[in-house]
Amino acid sequence: MTPADLAELLKTTAIVVLAERGLDAAALPQTVTVERPRNPEHGDYSSNLAMQLGKKVGANPLELAGWLAEVLAQAGGIADVEVAGPGFINMRLDASAQAMIVNTVINADKNFGHSDDLAGYQINLEFVSANPTGPIHIGGTRWAAVGDALGRLLSTQGAAVVREYYFNDHGAQIDRFTNSLIAAAKGELTPADGYAGTYVTDIAAQVMQQAPYALSLPESEMHETVREIGVDLMFTHIKKSLHEFGTDFDVYTHEDSMHASGRVDEAIARLRDTGNVYEKDGALWLRTSAFGDDKDRVVIKSDGKPAYIAGDLAYYLDKRQRGFDLCIYMLGADHHGYIARLKAAAAAFGDDPAIVEVLIGQMVNLVCDGQLVRMSKRSGNVITLDDLVEAIGVDAARYSLIRSSVDTPIDIDLALWSSSSNENPVYYVQYAHARLSALARNAAEFGLIPDTGHLELLSHDKEGALLRTVGEFPQVLKTAAALREPHRVCRYLEDLAGDYHRFYDSCRVLPQGDEKPTDLHTARLALCQANRQVIANGLAILGVSAPERM
């Protein structure tokens, strides 16, 4: 019996009890949940449903909990029910019901933990979206890991997710990048407002290989030629780095295309029709303050050129026209002002602002020998995705970036994350999977196969703890997806790995010496098979490998 099964049983019980007592069953929450109590002596699972319902239905919570406990105790799979405190319902499962989770996992295989909660939702998930003026920096790398994991997580809940990269190839920063390439190609100093680093020199050399005539062209043609080739080369490098990091996108949208295709003009025309733009001081303004922004925003500047927000407006409208129900933007720590701005833009088009979700990620630092690492060999003044992968590898890089809530700054200790020790969280989890894989190989050599026919024999305390943690996986995914918090998967996997290591130290899985195999051995093998599957499923969501040998 999974926690979800138990929660459904509790809900069904509540409906029966409320009806019998003439109380309003409509007061029941749509979703009933059960939780693991902090103190194992309080049972396997606990619920505060009686306290939630008491006031709503006009019943004493403690008395209501007693009524619920009386009926629950008669249900199959329930070993014991107790009422505690002001109305907590503490439940213990019998060994057979608790162990049924093993069958559930083995039958579901790679799909264990998946649900259809978000079926029918079309979600656009935009992340990284770094300017093509340099390699992906460490902050963008955090989004490359977290965004990809969030996309996988939402997909497990049934959503149709499109991962999208918005390619900012329009505006002043591209001009500065182009001027930097031209200066490097000419052997001149980097412009004061330009981009430095050996990558600029490398790309400039590649531009000259592709267009050796470029510097002899008239200035405007030279600028356009270098711009087009240089930006394409930079973006090719960015995509290659992301792919090697395990992050790929379904769609790449160019900001320049929003302007060239007339999308910006279309968006502004739509806003004129709604009356949500006005002219002032020779510029065109969007009434974002009417929709929660701190001030109105210029859309078309007094010189007739579109402001940056014009591209954002066109891009949002483009997403909605492609049929997305939810648009998630993952932005850096310096983009807090965009939250109100993007929601106001949605409202200005007549949409519910809730269609827009903005996640803000905090800073990332690398630490080596207790000191912050501040410089990169290639990019000069920032640490890049490639630097991090070179230092600790893809798996550790992804896991270290996903493991913390995005609203928390993180320091990545390079020595810790490159170590083969239990203090390294990704090693700890991967080692559990490798250990389980070795166990399966050793069992096969004995001629033993997992057997779910005697799961009721799994009655040891450490077996019970492991079974309960395995059973929590679907709820962990459900909660992590709803809160957009893939770090919860990391923390869960660490708990699961810990429960497995403690189980293995206390419960012998394979026969030793001349010992004959028993039903308990094969039942424990089945538990290990389920455990291994859940770890593999969790690591897959994170985009981290599940090694069979370490």
UniProtKB/Swiss-Prot annotation:
InterPro entries: aa-tRNA-synth_I_CS, Arg-tRNA-ligase, Arg-tRNA-synth_N, Arg-tRNA-synth_N_sf, ArgRS_core, DALR_anticod-bd, Rossmann-like_a/b/a_fold, tRNAsynth_Ia_anticodon-bd. It is found in: Cytoplasm. Belongs to the class-I aminoacyl-tRNA synthetase family. A motif ('HIGH' region) lies at residues 130-140. GO terms for biological process: arginyl-tRNA aminoacylation. The keyword tRNA-binding does not apply. It comes from Mycobacterium leprae (strain TN). PANTHER family: ARGININE--TRNA LIGASE, CYTOPLASMIC (PTHR11956:SF5), ARGINYL-TRNA SYNTHETASE (PTHR11956). This is Arginine--tRNA ligase. GO terms for molecular function: arginine-tRNA ligase activity; ATP binding. It is an enzyme of class 6 (ligase). Gene3D superfamilies: Arginyl tRNA synthetase N-terminal domain, HUPs, Isoleucyl-tRNA Synthetase, Domain 1. Its EC number is 6.1.1.19.
